Amino acid sequence: MQKLLLPFLLLAVTIALGQSKYITKSGSMSFEASQPTFEPIEATHSAVSALLNADTGELAVLALVRGFRFPLALMEEHFNENYIESHKYPKTSFKGSILNFDSNALSNQPRTVQLTGELSMHGVTKPISVYATITQSDELITLTSSFSVKTTDFGIEIPSLVRKQINQNVQIEVSLLLQRKQ
């Protein structure tokens, strides 16, 4: 009897631990750095990866920089080669947690939570604290956030020739539809 009980308990623990992880590989992220009266500077990314540990509230988000798509190919080229230097800094990431996270309090009613952690971009890592909205429906957790960062905080230099055309306060929108990991 004990020989049967141990494997069953190990299986139950493994299943329980596996159910606390939520993942996505198709999250979306967009940014906008437009200035009034100039051409819009905006891009979207639809292959953002994220992992949420629903037991602890730990969150990790990763976006490959070359995944951002612009309305114009030339903008995309300038972004990758001149500003963000994606050949040197191929990833942007967030690693942190949801403060006071309680997975039992999640529901289909949107709730505001605070994310704290480190944002890494362009070879620079900075502490960040932003607000997000979280909901849960069946096996899905949706997490959305809107915040801004300064290009100068991450060592992103904008040439003086176009400095007036690009807002140095970049507005970022993130939307993650996280599915329970099986």
Task: State each model region's role.
Residues 1-21:
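Bacterial Sec-dependent N-terminal signal peptides
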Residues 18-182:
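Low-complexity, acidic/polar, glycine-enriched regions of mature
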